[in-house]
Amino acid sequence: LGAKQPQMATTMSVRLEGQGKLSDGTTRFEFGLVKQGFAWAFPLAGGVNIGVGSFIGKQDADPEQVLAQLLPDLGFAADAGIRQRGQLRVWNGHHRLDGNGIVVVGDAASLCDPFLAEGLRPALMSGCEAARHLSPWLKGDSKDLRGYSRSMRERWGESMAWGRRIAQVFYRFPGVGYQLGIKRPTAPRRIAQILSGEMGYGDIAQRVIKRLLLQRN
């Protein structure tokens, strides 16, 4: 089940105590600091979680070099926090997520956002959807669990297909992507709307890709 050849993003996360210079309720994304990759800082209860990772290319980004720049800018020492290396299974296409009495959810289903590298919301979403479809199946009211795969495709996969297209262009041409996408006054609000589920990538994808390709040419 799931992706036959998963696409992985190599990551390093750092858990920090205190907020540093990060304001209450504020999330920070860095585009261009990591070649063909990402860096972000999410607030937690009593602290901050920082992630650095790379999507494209055989050579991984040097996360320590990135953190040496990012952490002081956030108000922390360059060597602060506990480092943890890992990998994210990035969404890379529509795949069947159910079998005979089996469903895959979260990271096992390769649901991580291919542009923002966010995986918590799809993990929660897939868990809730799995429960919603398993309940009638266990009661004998449903003959299979195919509805789970269909539901995740509609609720998550359709948007991620557009997100993947944006990421493929953006991370290859980050300078152009920054000027035409991230630097725009509406960009922070659009990112927040995508993270919250208020908006999907399909709502903005065609305009963004058209801007990126026209500028590149």
PLM regions and their residue ranges:
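C-terminal helical "tail/cap" subdomain of flavin- and related membrane-associated enzymes
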Residues: 132-217
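Predominantly flavin-linked oxidoreductase catalytic cores and closely associated redox partners
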Residues: 1-81, 89-96, 110
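Alpha-helical scaffold segments in soluble metabolic enzymes
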Residues: 40, 66-69, 129, 133, ...
